[in-house]
Amino acid sequence: DVGSAGDSDSIQITINVGEFNNIRHLTANRDLQIFTTTSELYIPSFADKGLTPTNTQIPRQTPYGASFVKPLPFDGATLYVQKTGKTIREYLFSDKESAYVSTPLSLISSHLISNPIQMASVKGAFDRPEQYAFIINDDGSMAVFHSIRNEEKAGFVKWSTTGRYHSVVAIDD
């Protein structure tokens, strides 16, 4: 009986967003984030206790949907490809809204995003605060997103090669 679950039982919960959804990704960042075909949701985490059947809730946050490309924790947020394959979004908790927001990062650089197939990132370091996200498109091109959040600097650039990019991996120091 799911209704009488104890804290040590499995979590079985229905995500009630009014439409059929397939979960595409679970990402651990500030909270456990859920990216589906039509929505972005999260399971709030608690500093003093773990997730249990008695304290789990899943509020819907944004209505965009995610592609099959794995989301990336990036510069305090989570980057993901919107289900259309044309937009890179930043899923970030807004204290002002008391909710997660999904800001389109690639809006003015949409010509650099074409059905991404893979993403990787290099985190900042003590001597290098900037972070980079490498986005491989299905046409073999690569877009690179650069961000320094605390200085409010960010932007996309196209990386060119004589051939095509097939895959990308980032190895931090």
Enumerate the language-model features and the residues they cover:
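Beta-propeller and closely related beta-pinwheel folds
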Residues: 1-129, 144-171
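Charge-patterned, long linear interaction tracts outside catalytic cores
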Residues: 127-141
